[in-house]
Amino acid sequence: MIFGSRRRIRGRWGGSGPLVRGLGTLGRALSLVWRRSLQLRVVTLTLGLSLAVILVLGFVLTSQITDRILEVKVKAATEEVERARNTVSGIVGGEESRSLESSLQLARNTLVDRKADVRADMAGAFDAVLVVPGDGPRAAAAAGPVAQIPEALRDFVKAGQVSYQYATVQTEGFSGPALIVGSPTTSSVPNLELYLIFPLNNEESTIALVRGTMATGGVVLLGLLAAIALVVARQIVQPVRSASRIAERFAEGHLTERMPVRGEDDMARLAVSFNDMAESLSRQIQQLEEFGNLQRRFTSDVSHELRTPLTTVRMAADLIYDHSEDLDPALRRSTELMVNELDRFETLLADLLEISRHDAGVAELSVESLDLRSTVRSALDNVGHLAADAGVELTLDMPEEDVIAEVDPRRVERILRNLIANAIDHAESKPVQIRMAADEDTVAVTVRDFGVGLRPGEEKLVFSRFWRSDPSRVRRSGGTGLGLAISIEDARLHQGRLEAWGEPGKGACFRLTLPLVRGHKVTTSPLPLKPASEQRPARRRSNKDREAAEESV
């Protein structure tokens, strides 16, 4: 039975899930609007402060008006009590033939029926109560609703004081709040107490009217303040919004956008300052574009101009190298060094030309649909001798099935060749892992070494041109310092990603992620960039891949 009750409770609360989620969504939407709208915050803050001021002012004014009305009422009631006391003294002590109850009733009727008196009209209508407490052999006597008189007030009157008190009374002709004024009398009847009950219905109506009028005026005033705040905030926010829109268009490349200048106030000075800043930025951007164009043109022109003399030098060097056996050992060694440096110089010129094409935006893809595994094997064939010279073991892990992708095989092979050669340079004779994996949309290749690694922040710098983490390290691959910079440009040309991870002493990992179909956007990668801490060298490659790698090495 208990478990059933719990299930019912959970079901009842579970039904409120959509409501809670809806309220959460609404709250987030309102919070977003609040954070993004300066005008809304200004108007809301103005209304909040105005409402607080109106409430405080209304409370103070209402309290003062109420106190003043009641003060006038108490004063008029006190004067009426003085007149009533004289009337009661004359009636009660006039004829001894009447009984005490008759005298008290006659005095009460006289007081109540005295409506023509102008002075009584100032205090308003009232009811009278006459009380004579019992004293020894004399019995107590009273006239009027004596039960409505508070005992605390009677105690003050018995002590000979004229006092008043607010109380809620219920008589034959009235029910509600009233002012009760009590006073002792000086008549032949000792200890005679006189009480006048003044209804406060007129005063209540007046106070309610005052409160209603002030509330209505406060609402109207609050609405006017809201309209004024909206107009003022709009006057302030409009130039800011205009500046924001123009800044966005300026960031999009519309360098001629400027803010309109109206008047000579603070907003006008803001517009002038903004326009001056935009003009300065536009001028600097144009200068940088001109410098960049000059730099790219210089790089391209120099690379082309150097090709002609380099070709001549290459022909002469090859001729000398072909007859190097006839030279003495020193000249033979010099010839070999010259040929090697010419090879490196030619590679540098080719890389500079490729960089200039990327900078000029004229690099194009020659897309083919092929099995990307063959491209990986081709890259291994080109750098296998480097691994053999450095004593580095290359492990390959690729899928058994074909991985068909629409890529430029020359550029992808160059990316992989640069990554593997870079890993061999920094592996410190430790293994280098090459892994490939694919999903429905993308294919990824990671190159992992366990060498010196990367310091924090260097995972971005490795793709900079001519950047080296350790200038004293010798490149086994004879690179130019532009390989990774060209590789990341080639990856972007495929709409792919080239990312790096590394830690000092733990090695580095480079991940290339490409779309299987040209034009698709890469959002995820089938391989992780940061390896798990317990990760060991990858599983052994297939027989076909092993044979291909062994042949290349």
Curated annotation (Swiss-Prot):
Ranges where the HAMP domain occurs: 234-286
Membrane-related topology note: Multi-pass membrane protein
Subunit and interaction comment: Interacts with MrtA.
Native species: Mycolicibacterium smegmatis (strain ATCC 700084 / mc(2)155)
Keywords: ATP-binding, Cell membrane, Kinase, Membrane, Nucleotide-binding, Phosphoprotein, Transferase, Transmembrane, Transmembrane helix, Two-component regulatory system
Mutant phenotype after disruption: Grows poorly with filamentous cells, often with bulbous regions and a chain-like phenotype indicating possible defects in septum splitting and cell wall metabolism. Increased sensitivity to lysozyme. Decreased expression of the MtrA/MtrB regulon genes dnaA, ripA, and fbpB.
Pfam families (alphabetical): HAMP, HATPase_c, HisKA
Disordered: annotated segments: 523-553
NCBIfam families, per database record: MtrAB_MtrB
Protein name: Sensor histidine kinase MtrB
